[in-house]
């Protein structure tokens, strides 16, 4: 039962250091394997329209990073798979669960993507289980990620249906308002939800949402994530597809949720909002900084690789991360 677990989120946790065994943080290996491929970092930009487009996906794949292309350009998905495969790059796409998606999946036999993410807000659903089974029947070699979920029961059901990984997080993201609109979600206790779900998982878990700092990546690994999906930290770059808007001489980029009226084009069943983020530099600069910060985290863990973060002790001190720093 959930009540047996302490409830906390990223800002409530600090990891406890161990003796360092490497001479330089540069020796720490941040790579992670998901399915048949190994990637430079255990992070993936959120599959949202203001985070990545085909060009960003290509840049990530060429750089050795995992990506998941969003599902909001449905007609462009097959040409995208071809574009990536023609360059010797992995193809990683998203699908929904509507009836026409079944025919779409069946069309992929000729040019099969390495990864498919079933991407709906409430992933513990018969419709998702049915789609997992369909993909596995039609494309048995494709790695299937299913989500989003927030309970151990959901993780087990999706794994049993054939999912190769589950995505955990119901509404903790910066532009997600699910918890406000519906009363449901993992916002405010996403890290505890991740821990709860990970204890039931036999296959990889992708933590999705609520990441506000690079240190949250290490915390996610500690509590059971194999990969971490990140939205706001990857939004607002020069390469980001979001519109650039000038306000009082300062450059901003728009960032909106996948269930917002800005994505849907209509105000119906809205569970996302739009915000403006100060424009950042290049995406690669953020990826490099994430890698360096994760290398430092591994060194503090007394480890040499990402998996060593899973064994560190931690302390729960509510909202302690910004103690003594009034600017936050």
Curated annotation (Swiss-Prot):
EC number, UniProt record: 1.7.1.7
Catalytic activity from the UniProt record: IMP + NH4(+) + NADP(+) = GMP + NADPH + 2 H(+)
Keyword field contains NADP: yes
Superkingdom of this protein's organism: Bacteria
Keyword NADP: yes
Location of the active site: 176
InterPro entries the record matches: Aldolase_TIM, GMP_reductase, GuaC_type_2, IMP_DH/GMP_Rdtase_CS, IMP_DH_GMPRt
Keywords on record: NADP, Oxidoreductase
Any one Pfam family match given in the protein's UniProt record, by short name: IMPDH
Positions bound to NADP(+): 205-228
One annotated GO biological process: purine nucleotide metabolic process
Name of the top EC class for this enzyme: oxidoreductase
A GO MF term: GMP reductase activity
GO cellular component term, pick one: GMP reductase complex
Function text: Catalyzes the irreversible NADPH-dependent deamination of GMP to IMP. It functions in the conversion of nucleobase, nucleoside and nucleotide derivatives of G to A nucleotides, and in maintaining the intracellular balance of A and G nucleotides.
Family per record: Belongs to the IMPDH/GMPR family. GuaC type 2 subfamily.
Protein name: GMP reductase
Organism: Streptococcus pneumoniae serotype 4 (strain ATCC BAA-334 / TIGR4)
């Amino acid at each position: 039962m959930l009540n047996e677990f302490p409830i906390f989120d990223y800002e409530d946790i600090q990891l406890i250091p161990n003796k360092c065994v490497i001479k330089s943080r540069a020796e720490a290996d941040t790579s992670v394997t998901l399915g048949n491929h190994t990637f430079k970092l255990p992070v993936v930009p959120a599959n949202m329209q203001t985070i990545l487009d085909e060009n960003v996906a290509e840049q990530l794949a060429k750089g050795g990073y995992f990506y998941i292309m969003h599902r909001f350009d449905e007609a462009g998905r097959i040409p995208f798979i071809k574009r990536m495969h023609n360059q010797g790059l992995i193809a990683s796409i998203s699908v929904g669960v509507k009836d026409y998606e079944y025919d779409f999946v069946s069309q992929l036999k000729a040019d099969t993507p390495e990864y498919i993410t079933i991407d709906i807000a409430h992933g513990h659903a018969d419709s998702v289980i049915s789609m997992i089974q369909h993909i596995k029947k039609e494309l048995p070699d494709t790695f299937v990620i299913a989500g989003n979920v927030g309970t151990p029961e959901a993780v087990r059901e999706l794994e049993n249906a054939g999912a190769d990984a589950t995505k955990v997080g119901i509404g903790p993201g910066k532009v997600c308002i699910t918890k406000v609109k519906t009363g449901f979600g993992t916002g405010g206790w996403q890290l505890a939800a991740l821990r709860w779900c990970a204890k039931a998982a036999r296959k990889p878990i992708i933590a999705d949402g609520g990441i506000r700092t690079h240190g949250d990546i290490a915390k996610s690994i500690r509590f059971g994530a194999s990969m971490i999906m990140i939205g706001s930290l990857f939004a607002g770059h020069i390469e980001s597809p979001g519109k650039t808007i000038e306000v009082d001489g300062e450059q901003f980029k728009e960032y909106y949720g996948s269930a917002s009226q800005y994505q849907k084009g209509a105000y119906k069943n809205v569970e996302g909002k739009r915000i403006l983020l100060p424009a950042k530099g290049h995406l690669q600069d953020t990826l490099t900084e994430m890698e360096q910060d994760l290398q430092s985290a591994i060194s503090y863990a007394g480890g040499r690789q990402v998996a060593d973060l899973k064994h560190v002790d931690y302390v729960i001190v509510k909202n302690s991360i910004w103690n003594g720093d009034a600017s936050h």
